[in-house]
Amino acid sequence: MLKTLNRRSWTCRQCIRILRRNAETRRYFQGASAASPLCQHTVSSSTSDKARDDQTLRLIFDSEPFWREFSQPKSSTSKRTGLLQNQYLTGPDGFLQFAQVSLQKCQKIVAKVIAASTLEDYRGMVRDLDRLSDLLCRVIDMAEFMKLNHPSPQIQDAATQAYALMFEYMNVLNTTPELDAQLKRASADLNVTSHWSPEEKVAARVLLKDFSQSAIHLPPKDRQKFVALSNEISQLGPMFVTNRQPETDHVTVDKNKLRGMDPSLIQQLQRWRKVAVPMFGDIPRIALYSVHDEETRKEIYVTSRTSSKVQIRRLETLLQKRAELAKLAGFPSYAHMTLSDKMAKTPEAVVNFLEALNASNRGQVQDELSQLLALKQADVPSATQLQPWDHAYYVHQYSARHSRVRRSRESTLLPAFFSIGTVIQGLSRLFTRLYGIRLVPTETLPGEIWNPDVRRLDVVDESDRRLAVIYCDLFTRPYKSPNPTHFTLRGSREISQAEIAECADLSSSLHPNDGMATTIKPETNKLYQLPTVALICDFDQSESRSTPSLLNEHNLETLFHEMGHAVHSVLARTDLQTISGTRCATDFVELPSVIMENFATAPEVLALYARHWETNEPLPEHMVKSMELNRQSRVSMHGGMDNEVQILMALLDQAYHSSRPLEPNFDSTRIYHDVYSTHSSLPDPPGSRTSWQGYFAHLVGYGATYYSYLFDRAIANKVWSDVFKGGELSTNRDAGERFKNEVLRWGGGRDGWNCVAGLLGNNPANDNGKLAEGGEEAMREVGRWGLGLMGTSEL
């Protein structure tokens, strides 16, 4: 998952994740060296040093004694650096200072852009606005990250204040039409645009699109209404997410009706001979897969999928406000407004994709349901069809009867081969083979990290030049979010000579990247801020920490997924921050992370790293085969239905963000039943008036874009099959370079369809390069590719 900021962002449309950093650091077992803050950092390229780095990478995560020694300062300096080596963030007061200094720089840039009149001014305008975007992101992203992840309440409060100051200023920019007018003037002048680089032209289009979506072109009265609607929407969203509740809190049934359910759980819920089954939390799910009595399952199913009327009103108000906002901005619907800068472009194209995908998935669904119906008929010979409240129950029954591998001793031994250190080591080895980069464990300076458990990894290339910095905060702790997330802390960007001079004029101690990581590109001799990212996970540790943290298969794929986002940030080292790293179309950004899930368990990749944490023995071949058979068994029994559930949610999302919310008798429940009765293999019974949509929290964060994850899964399935040959080329350098050069290195600087077309080349699916144009037929073609055996977890 990428962290998405819920803010309008003409400057950082895809500030879709959060944050950044620098200053020279020292390596383990090496003394500190006095390095210029602007000099390029390199590490030793000797074979022995690389082997030591590889071993150290594993040990800093797996060995607590080794980590304690490694993380001890190797010099006597008592001076503390700032968080992420940001020179302002040495304490809570530094957040406001950082925001104020950045704000002053922003104001100067805005004044310069508004006053622009010469060709030289207009030719430099995109870079000026990109720097404005970067200055805003530096503060907002950093503050948002620390607000969510720093354990100190004082730091959290200070970060909140800094965030509020810059967010308020961003709202001022969103009501400054002169910026939009000046950029339009520059973009319309061939004497200007002929001097722009391809990146500058893309960034200009992105910025103009963001201006249009903030309704900056509207008359003042309409613009005020747009801001008011936006504020209402921003308040309704969290209210909808945090108030999901059923219309009826409990279903009361006789104890004997719950046979099959865990007796200890029944006892907790029992009152005399009756049991009050709550309709929230995990209990309904547990009941649906374990209770033998069909009528009881039906009652629990229907009741648990019926939202409170208040919650439905909240949703309908939210959808109506979004539709009004889009209409005010000149779009037919909220979906049209949201999708205009995505690969899909239109809601019609999204529906084409989803219907084609549903058709390609239907055969598997019917096979699954036929097997489950046979199980039901063994229990109830007169049964002629499977009901929606039967599905979980008979999947569970099938698993209990057939999935011996799951219950075998062998499956319980698998995590011992996937310690976190072993997996990180494997990721580094994989990246070396695919992209010629590796992860180097690096000592942090006092004050640099927000928690003692955070590890810093530098990413270096084959010339041992540093490319990026990754902070790994992977272990659970009190009050930490359980959601795995990739945060962009600072994106790639060229730092101009003017910025360097500006810092020197202000103070000899100031750094043009606030003290965070920089490098000099040898090809151009220009200074760049390095991509800096954080990976947040919530993996358990043993209480004594005497044994390493071991990952099950789900957590293994999660770590590979998040590292897929990270490598996208690392390799998309653009000149402009606006299009750096993961700042690309929402329906393209998950491709690198989704495809990484396939690498996690590919036999060729497992051979690189899967070793027992204690004996160092490689994962036996028969266990590799068992993993694959178990995965195929899961997918063959409910993978198709899992896919259909996601497809239906995406179709419902499109229906809700059409123009229908503006109709006088808009009824979200009727639309829900229309969509499901048309497309579902197991629709809710007619007349049930279930209203599951009240639980659909992703409507808030992914309004009109819920299809994106499915879309990227379909593309990833095709790429894995055709480029990486289903895993045969999963460690092949040519295949890796192809993926890097056609997809990863561009960030948001190349249209996603061109990336896909370039990647597939002469593949029949891309006959005559037809995918490069995108459009409704291209969306339908991707739907035909299907989802394969890839992960089926939702967003």
Swiss-Prot record:
Alphabetical UniProt keywords: Hydrolase, Metal-binding, Metalloprotease, Mitochondrion, Protease, Transit peptide, Zinc
Keyword Metal-binding: yes
Transit peptide residues according to the UniProt entry: 1-22
Transit peptide as UniProt keyword: yes
Family in the record: Belongs to the peptidase M3 family.
Catalytic activity: Release of an N-terminal octapeptide as second stage of processing of some proteins imported into the mitochondrion
Protein name in the entry: Mitochondrial intermediate peptidase
Main location: mitochondrion
InterPro entries to which the protein is assigned, alphabetical: M3A_MIP, MetalloPept_cat_dom_sf, Neurolysin/TOP_dom2, Pept_M3A_M3B, Pept_M3A_M3B_dom
Gene source species: Coccidioides immitis (strain RS) (Valley fever fungus)
Gene name for this UniProt entry: OCT1
Function noted in UniProt: Cleaves proteins, imported into the mitochondrion, to their mature size. While most mitochondrial precursor proteins are processed to the mature form in one step by mitochondrial processing peptidase (MPP), the sequential cleavage by MIP of an octapeptide after initial processing by MPP is a required step for a subgroup of nuclear-encoded precursor proteins destined for the matrix or the inner membrane.
Domain of life: Eukaryota
The EC number(s) this enzyme carries: 3.4.24.59
